[in-house]
Structure formats: C-alpha cells, structure tokens
Amino acid sequence: MATQKTFVMIKPDGVRRKLIGEIVGRIERKGLRIAAMKMVKIDRETANKLYEEHIGKSFFNELVSYITSGPVVCMVVEGDEAVRVMRTLIGATDPKEASPGTIRGDLALSKAENVIHASDAEEKAKREMSLFFSPNEITE
C-alpha cells in the first residue's frame, strides 16, 4: 500500500459544535496520522481557490459564505491510501445518505453544514494542502 497525504478540513459548523476532538480521534483511530494541523479563518479569495470547481454553480456563493463564516481546522492527514480511507471515513456529502459510523452519518446535521471536507483525489489534495500549509509546516 502506498503512503499518501491528503487534505482534511473541519468546517465552521464542526468547530462551532465542538467536534474537533471527536473528529481527530476518529481519524487517528483509523490508523491515519495528523502531519499538520491549524485553525484558520478562511478569506473569500482562499475559499474561491478551494472550491474553484464549483464556480458558476447555483450553490457557490452560499458555499463561500458558509466556509468563511467562522474558523475551520485544516489538517494534512497521512497514511496508507489516505485519500480513499478519509473519503470512506467521512461518508456521503448528504448526511441522510451517509452510513452510520461515518463522520457525516453520525455528526452532520444537513447537506449544507456537513462538518468536514476531505480531498477526493491525490492531485486535488496536493493543491488544497498548498493553500493552507507551506512544506516546512508538514511533519514527516
């Protein structure tokens, strides 16, 4: 199995609802390692870059407003097949469709405020990590 790094972000509703410890614990119990972590307030410019694939879609402005509404916790998560493992761990975007035992299935309240983001591909993970972390901030 190949060790990968992926980008994970606890969204404003997860921070507001005090779910940081619960989510980090689930990631670590899955055998993944937190290689970097910081709490930040995302500005609109960074939000536009993070969600650039959604520019022009009907929900884009609402998404940017939400993600800039409060602090988020950004992480670089490392482990065997980290991208795939994290995507499975977080569950479907809509918590009504997310399996019990997944982060969204257990913790998310709505599709709009679904607690967590995780990169869906290795190249995307690299781009998203670079928005929030310099190489010297990521531990080996």
Curated annotation (Swiss-Prot):
Sorted alphabetically, the keyword list is: ATP-binding, Cytoplasm, Kinase, Magnesium, Metal-binding, Nucleotide metabolism, Nucleotide-binding, Phosphoprotein, Transferase
Report the cofactors: Mg(2+)
Q: Active-site positions, per UniProt?
A: 117 (pros-phosphohistidine intermediate)
Listed under catalytic activity are: a 2'-deoxyribonucleoside 5'-diphosphate + ATP = a 2'-deoxyribonucleoside 5'-triphosphate + ADP; a ribonucleoside 5'-diphosphate + ATP = a ribonucleoside 5'-triphosphate + ADP
What are the GO BP annotations of this UniProt entry?
Answer: CTP biosynthetic process; GTP biosynthetic process; UTP biosynthetic process
> Which EC number(s) does UniProt give?
2.7.4.6
As for subcellular location, the record says: Cytoplasm
GO CC terms for this protein? cytoplasm
User: What SMART domains does the annotation carry?
Assistant: NDK
Q: Which CDD domains match?
A: NDPk_I (cd04413)
Any GO MF annotation of the entry: metal ion binding
- Binding-site list for ATP: 11, 59, 87, 93, 104, 114
Q: Return the InterPro entries for the record.
A: NDK-like_dom, NDK-like_dom_sf, Nucleoside_diP_kinase, Nucleoside_diP_kinase_AS
Alphabetical list of Pfam families matching this protein: NDK
Report the family membership: Belongs to the NDK family.
- Protein name (Swiss-Prot/TrEMBL): Nucleoside diphosphate kinase
Q: Which organism is it from?
A: Metallosphaera sedula (strain ATCC 51363 / DSM 5348 / JCM 9185 / NBRC 15509 / TH2)
Its lineage reads:
Archaea, Thermoproteota, Thermoprotei, Sulfolobales, Sulfolobaceae
Q: Which gene encodes it?
A: ndk
